[in-house]
């Protein structure tokens, strides 16, 4: 009896937690130029932009954490894209980036401006354009 009661309480807690989760927001489809022209409008929002990979850098931190950064080039305008992990993209690939845009973000002593965080844990992704 006691085991069933405990199991019932655990089940209710799980259902309650699942009900509180919000679905991932639909990203705002925009352009690199629009992000650069009006960064306040998109700050901390999920965006989707298309462009070409330029200045690709795949690194591993001293702590062993892999990351990828590149410039997303579209119509002569560029914006930085960051993601944890080594992405399967190459220089000059045409890609679709979904991620959280930051007008300005501080990480430790560094400040990053006009950057998209496309990390999967942030709900982001980078995929090759079909």
Where are these regions (language model features)?
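Bacterial N-terminal signal peptides
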Residues: 6-16
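OB-fold and OB-like single-stranded nucleic-acid-recognition modules
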Residues: 19-130
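Positively charged n-region of N-terminal signal peptides that target proteins for export
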Residues: 1-5
């Amino acid at each position: 009896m006691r085991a069933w009661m405990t199991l019932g309480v655990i089940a209710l807690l799980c259902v309650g937690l699942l009900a509180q989760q919000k679905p991932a927001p639909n990203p705002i489809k925009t352009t690199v130029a629009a992000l650069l022209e009006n960064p306040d409008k998109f700050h901390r929002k999920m965006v989707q932009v298309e462009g070409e990979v330029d200045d690709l850098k795949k690194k591993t931190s001293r702590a062993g954490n892999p990351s990828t950064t590149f410039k997303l080039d579209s119509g002569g305008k560029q914006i930085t894209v960051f993601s944890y992990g080594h992405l399967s993209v190459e220089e000059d690939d045409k890609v679709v980036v979904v991620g959280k845009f930051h007008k300005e973000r501080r990480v430790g002593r560094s400040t990053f401006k006009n950057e998209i965080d496309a990390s999967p844990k942030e709900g982001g992704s980078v995929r090759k354009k079909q």
